Amino acid sequence: MNTNPLLQFDALPRFGAIQAEHVAPAIDQLLREAEAALERAVGPDVAADYDALSAVLDVATERLGRAWGTVSHLHSVADTPELRAAFNHNLPKVTAFHTRLGADERLFAKYKAVAASPSSARLPAPRKKALANALRDFVPVSVFSESPNV
């Protein structure tokens, strides 16, 4: 059993048990899990199917989001110099992952294939909306690498 309270997802966050030294190990582990989930999702073993993609990505990204949300909440309401340092150290890593997730051309191609498949017409409304949002919010990597002409 993991003793890091940021890695315990069976109940509400145990805010009082969370210390600054828990942040980096938890976020690093959850980022590794989320990165691995992304690689699995875009690989050949996961069909271009909403449920298949969701099964691979949702758990990992939800766990990361839940842990990071807890850290962010504590940073807002019970900040200490140590927690602020842990938050500031991990913020770029979490941001970089979400940027990569939203700009991954391989994932975008899978989502486009899902949207183009006949099964997408049978998706429940919330899933159709989530799929439409994923396609709408995709940002090509080239947006981040081009220098603005000023």
What are these regions (language model features)?
Residues M1-V150:
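Zn2+-dependent metallopeptidase catalytic domains
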